[in-house]
Amino acid sequence: MKIDVLTLFPEMFHALDHSIVGRAKTLGQVEMSFLNFRDFSTNKHHKVDDYPYGGGAGMLLTPQPIFDAFHSLEAKSPRVILTTPTGKPFNQRMAEVWAKEEHLVFLCGHYEGFDQRIHDELATDEVSIGDFVLTGGELATMVMIDATVRLIPDVLNAQASHEDDSFSTGLLEYPHYTRPADFRGLTVPDVLLSGNHARIEAWRREQSLERTYRRRPDLLEHVELTDVDKKFLQSLRD
């Protein structure tokens, strides 16, 4: 996969040189470049922003530098993701779809956002990572890159490492425990020490259902529930 990022702050992306994403870059599983679109400004002062027509607070990113930076990529039908608080909420399903793409381009917003023509002519996806406003799209882009790259085949050591993640099944993930079995009187649930895989799977399913019910009940509307699941959830409501 190839990922290009158009940003005013390419130096922020050094964080992606570490951990799983950094290893994927080193192994050639993903190729990344970070273009400062200020370098493409034809303004003598290299300005990339201007006042909005019709008035209003703040400054907008102008089309010229971003269009020219984008076309310098000579990309063939990439998926172009524009970061904006008005976009669709990013989720695990998006990451799963994007992980199958050959080429992703991220446009990092700043100031009061982009001139609408950038939205209309360049973006294939307008995406937000939550109901809050950041100073720029760089952190949001790093979040989305991390969530996507880890799903590329062979990036994680084991496929199951992400197949059981929260949201991959539609439910929040169950609790995890490791050694020691008793830490200062805090013990691991007996079922996990039983060696009975059927009981362990049933326990994990119930834990996922309960955690989702108590923390993100909205997710249950989109999960295919068995009769056993429904009975367990009803017991929580009672």
From Swiss-Prot:
List residues binding S-adenosyl-L-methionine. Answer: G109, I129, G130, D131, F132, V133, L134
Where is it localised? Cytoplasm
> What is a single cellular component term in the Gene Ontology annotation?
cytosol
Reaction catalysis annotation: guanosine(37) in tRNA + S-adenosyl-L-methionine = N(1)-methylguanosine(37) in tRNA + S-adenosyl-L-homocysteine + H(+)
- MF GO annotations: tRNA (guanine(37)-N1)-methyltransferase activity
Where mainly located? cytoplasm
Q: Which InterPro entries match?
A: Alpha/beta_knot_MTases (IPR029028), tRNA_m1G_MeTrfase_C_sf (IPR023148), tRNA_m1G_MeTrfase_TrmD (IPR002649), tRNA_m1G_MTases_N (IPR029026), tRNA_MeTrfase_TRMD/TRM10 (IPR016009)
**Any one GO biological process:** tRNA N1-guanine methylation
What is a single Pfam family found in this protein's UniProt entry?
Answer: tRNA_m1G_MT
UniProt KW Nucleotide-binding keyword: no
Q: What is its EC number?
A: 2.1.1.228
Q: Indicate yes or no for the key word Cytoplasm.
A: yes
The UniProt keyword set, sorted, is: Cytoplasm, Methyltransferase, S-adenosyl-L-methionine, Transferase, tRNA processing
What is the recorded function of this protein according to its Swiss-Prot or TrEMBL entry? Specifically methylates guanosine-37 in various tRNAs.
Give the family per the record: Belongs to the RNA methyltransferase TrmD family.
**Subunit comment:** Homodimer.
Please report the name of this protein according to its UniProt entry: tRNA (guanine-N(1)-)-methyltransferase
Q: Which organism is it from?
A: Exiguobacterium sp. (strain ATCC BAA-1283 / AT1b)
